[in-house]
Amino acid sequence: SNEITGSGKTEDLVENHKLLNDLCHKLDATRPTTMAHIFMLDANDPLVFLPDIRSYNLYYGWYVGEWDQNDAWFDEFHKNHPDAVIGLSEYGADANPAYQSAKPAKGDWSEGYQAVYHEHMLKMWADRPYIWAMHCWNMFDFGADGRDEGGKPGQNQKGLVTFDRKTKKDAFYIYKAYLSKEPFVHICGRRYADRTESETKIKVYSNQPRVTLFVDGKEFAAQDGDKIFKFTVPISGEHTIEARS
């Protein structure tokens, strides 16, 4: 079940899920049962502990609060229930690749904010081995008739890839940095072309240990790092930026 208590919890609802949980075990005792809980459900509610393992849909850093509240939520749950298997069944932030900003912020639908949000979420997961799984919402932008936001009516834009499957947003590549063994470098913010600042931030994602940045064909700087590499580059006109590893 997904967010089954979104409209409230009743005795019938709980009893029905007890029956379903028992049926699942009867059909295949080797497979654990699980539920995806809406974030409003108290983490100490008995329903949370009905299945063998459980996950929560949390949107701190997008719909509510700040992204570090995800960290605090999991730390508190694990402290109170150290033997309970817990995961993250939904999380995400909307982004329209046409929206660019030098100072991305929550709620601006910018590609840059989505990227830094997912940077945080992946580090949170990597730092907490007790989180059994995270399920990013979503791989692709998808149709949502009731939505009219972020410049694209009828779409949920939480995907790491656009609705037409043609454009990988910057956030796609931070997942590649964590999860892929295929060597790569990716310069973020490439759609942010018209920049007004005299010094601009260039961010590179890579699964390689060292990245070298070239500006107008000349080596600018090299960095050793882990997945995220940041450079400050003076700009005064049109420039060509290249990253190599």
Residue spans for each PLM region:
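Extended substrate-binding grooves/exosites of carbohydrate-active enzymes
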Residues: S1-D224, T232-R244
